[in-house]
Amino acid sequence: MKTLCYIVLFFGATTSLAQQTLEQVLLKYNKQSIPYISAEMLIDIKNDPTIVLLDSREKKEYEVSHIKGALYAGYEDFNLQEVSKNIKSIDTPIIVYCSLGVRSEDIAETLQKAGYTNIKNLYGGIFNWKNNNLPVVNRQQKPTDSVHVYSKKWGKWLTKGIKVNNK
C-alpha cells in the first residue's frame, strides 16, 4: 500500500510540474526586456491611428489569421528597413506580437536597438488574444476562428479557435 501511495505521489508531482502557466513559459523563454501590454489594454487603444501593430510570426501564420490592422513584420525574414517605412518616428507607439510573446520580444529588442523607444509586447500573443474571444482576420480581411499554432508544443496554449498547423 505504501508503494502505491509513493507511485501516485510521484506521478502527481511529475504531472503538475509539466503543467506550466503562461507566465512561467514567458519567464522561461523571454528576458522580460520589453514591457508587456495586455489584450484588454490593446483593445482600448487599437484604433488609435498613431499605433503601429506588428505581427512577428512567419508569413504562413500571418495569412491564416492576424489581428485586424496588424502589419506583417515576420521573424526569420524580418527586415528592419522595410518595417521602419511604416513607423513615423522613434517614439511612435509600437506593439509587437507573435503566437505567445517569445518571437515578438526578439523583434521588439531589434527595434529598440534601432532607436525606437515606445515598444510593447502583447502578453500571450495572438493565442491569448483569441482565447479572450477577440477577433482575428484572414488574408482576405474576413473574420475567422482559425489560428496558426506554429507547432504542436505551442498549440496547446490556444484554447479557443481552430488550430491550424501547415508545416
Each predicted region: which residue ranges?
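Short hydrophobic beta-strand that contains or immediately precedes a catalytic carboxylate
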Residues: 42, 50-57, 70
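A general structural motif
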Residues: 49-51, 91-93
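Short, surface-exposed ligand- or partner-binding patches at beta-edge/loop junctions that are enriched
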Residues: 97
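Residue-level detector of alpha-helix initiation sites
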Residues: 101-102
